[in-house]
Amino acid sequence: MIILKLGGSVITRKDSEEPAIDRDNLERIASEIGNASPSSLMIVHGAGSFGHPFAGEYRIGSEIENEEDLRRRRFGFALTQNWVKKLNSHVCDALLAEGIPAVSMQPSAFIRAHAGRISHADISLIRSYLEEGMVPVVYGDVVLDSDRRLKFSVISGDQLINHFSLRLMPERVILGTDVDGVYTRNPKKHPDARLLDVIGSLDDLESLDGTLNTDVTGGMVGKIRELLLLAEKGVESEIINAAVPGNIERALLGEEVRGTRITGKH
C-alpha cells in the first residue's frame, strides 16, 4: 500500500487572496495517478489557499481569549471546514475523471485532537475502503480539540500522514510538494541552495534558514518533524516535486525520482 500526499501548494494557488485551484497541476497529477494505477493507494492532500488563510485569520488552534473570541472562532472553524471540503470535492472530481475510485473522507467527521495532536481517529472505514480496492482521500482540516483552552485545532496533511502511516504501515510514503525536496535554503530565493538527499534527524536541518514557507501547519520544518517521527517507527518517506510532469507517476511506479528521503538515524 502507498500513501501519497499532494501538497496544497501544488494543487492550489496558495498565494492567491481567494481560494483558487491550480487546475493544470491537479488534472495532470490525477492523470499520472491513473496511469500508474497502484494496487492499493490512499491520498492525503493539503488545504492550500482553501484552508490556511481562514485558519490563520481566525487563529484556529491558538488559545481562546474570551467569550467573544470563542464565538468568532466557532464561525472561523465552520468557514474553514466548508472551504477545505470544497477543495476535496475538486480533488475527487479530478480523480474520478481518470477512472480512479476516489472516496472522500472528511477528517473533522472522524478525528478528534488534544492540544493540536490527533487523539482519536476511527480508521476502520479507511481500512474497509482499501480492502475493497477504493482510494480513500483525506485532507488537512479543522477538528474539535479536547483542550479547553483551544477547543479547535488545525490538523495538517502531514500530521495525517504520520498518524495513518503508523497505523496502516504502508510500504511507501510519497510527499509531492512544489520543490524538489528539502534544501539548505529556500531554492526559490537562493540559487546556491543545495538539495539534501537524505535527512536522518533534526540536526540535519541546522543549516536551514527557517522554514521554506511558514504557514499555520508549520511549513517545511513542520513536515520534516512529522516524517522523522514516522521514520523512528520504521516507515521511511520521500519528498519529491509534484509540479514536475511525470514525477508522481514515476514515484508511484517505484522508479527513482530526484528528491529527499526521510530516514531514521543514519
Swiss-Prot record:
Residue numbers marked as site, Transition state stabilizer = 14
- The UniProt record gives the binding positions of substrate as 47, 52, 157
A GO BP term here is: terpenoid biosynthetic process
Top-level EC class, please? Answer: transferase
EC numbers: 2.7.4.26
Q: Which Pfam families match?
A: AA_kinase
Record's GO cellular component terms: cytosol
The record, for SUPFAM superfamilies, names: Carbamate kinase-like (SSF53633)
Q: What is the pH-activity profile?
A: Optimum pH is 6.8-9.7.
- GO molecular function: any one? ATP binding
What InterPro entries does the record tag this protein with? AceGlu_kinase-like_sf, Asp/Glu/Uridylate_kinase, Fosfomycin_R_FomA-type
Which residues are noted in the entry as ATP-binding? Answer: 5-9, 48, 178, 183-188, 219, 223
Question: Which range is the signal sequence, renumbered to this chain?
Answer: none
Catalytic activity of the protein: isopentenyl phosphate + ATP = isopentenyl diphosphate + ADP
Keywords of the record: ATP-binding, Isoprene biosynthesis, Kinase, Nucleotide-binding, Transferase
Report the temperature dependence from the record: Optimum temperature is 70 degrees Celsius, but the enzyme is not stable above 50 degrees Celsius.
Per the entry, what this protein does is: Catalyzes the formation of isopentenyl diphosphate (IPP), the building block of all isoprenoids. Has lower activity with dimethylallyl phosphate (DMAP) and isopentenyl thiolophosphate (ISP). Has low activity with 1-butyl phosphate (BP) and 3-buten-1-yl phosphate (BEP). Has no significant activity with geranyl phosphate (in vitro).
Q: Which family does it belong to?
A: Belongs to the isopentenyl phosphate kinase family.
Under the subunit heading, UniProt states:
Homodimer.
Please identify the protein, giving its name as recorded: Isopentenyl phosphate kinase
According to its UniProt entry, this protein's organism is: Methanothermobacter thermautotrophicus (strain ATCC 29096 / DSM 1053 / JCM 10044 / NBRC 100330 / Delta H)
Q: What is the lineage of its organism?
A: Archaea, Methanobacteriati, Methanobacteriota, Methanomada group, Methanobacteria
